């Protein structure tokens, strides 16, 4: 956690690479949120939240969290509600200040790098699966329909990769448009994830629902 992504360009790139690796290995820990912590507060991590029923995937973690809205209102997380699915819990907040506008862009961009790592891994596993699995005496990868689906997924992944690099550069340069770039990246990441995960799930067939290795 000694990386300094807010004031050091090398630290910013290293933080993005670390988040991508965490996503690739499906690490069940909010690495991006820890790395995005504000430099002017004594806190362990930053959570970008919505205005109504704020929640985050930090259930069971006892770290000191700071939450920030898109308009820069920062709050201290004083408690958590019951843990829901995927480690998500509602947050109890105490407003701290309204000085968090500069914190938001990085808090949005780094989690997108985590999601990008997940897409990297999903496509890698799917390519390996269709190259091994056979139907009608041929590997799945030899069928044109499968190739088209994988191409669509890779186009989404590679497009997100380029946009993530641009948004990271925008944050590092402290451009006035950095927040807009971060929001565009977030929207693109969610759209790409829907397509990539759907394709990968479909091409894994029943393996997507059960363990066929035993």
Where do the language-model regions lie?
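Alpha-helical interface subdomain recognition
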Residues: 1-25, 108-214
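FAD-binding core of flavoproteins
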Residues: 24-124, 128
């Amino acid at each position: 956690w000694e990386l300094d992504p807010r004031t050091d360009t090398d630290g910013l790139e290293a933080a993005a690479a670390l988040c991508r690796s965490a996503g690739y290995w499906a690490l069940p820990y909010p690495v991006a949120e820890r790395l995005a912590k504000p430099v002017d507060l004594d806190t362990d991590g930053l959570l970008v939240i919505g205005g109504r029923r704020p929640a985050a995937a930090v259930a069971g973690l006892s770290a000191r969290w700071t939450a920030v809205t898109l308009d820069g209102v920062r709050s201290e997380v004083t408690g958590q509600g019951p843990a829901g699915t995927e480690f998500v819990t509602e947050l109890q907040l105490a407003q701290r200040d309204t000085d968090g506008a500069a914190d938001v862009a990085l808090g949005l961009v780094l989690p997108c790098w985590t999601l990008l790592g997940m897409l990297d891994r999903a496509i890698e596993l799917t390519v390996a699966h269709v190259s091994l699995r056979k139907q009608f005496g041929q590997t799945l990868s030899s069928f044109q329909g499968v190739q088209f689906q994988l191409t669509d997924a890779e186009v989404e992944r590679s497009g997100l990769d380029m946009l993530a690099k641009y948004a990271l550069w925008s944050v590092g340069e402290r451009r006035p448009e950095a927040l807009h770039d971060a929001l565009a990246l977030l929207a693109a990441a969610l759209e790409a994830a829907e397509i990539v995960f759907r394709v990968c799930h479909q091409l894994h067939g029943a393996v997507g629902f059960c363990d066929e290795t035993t």
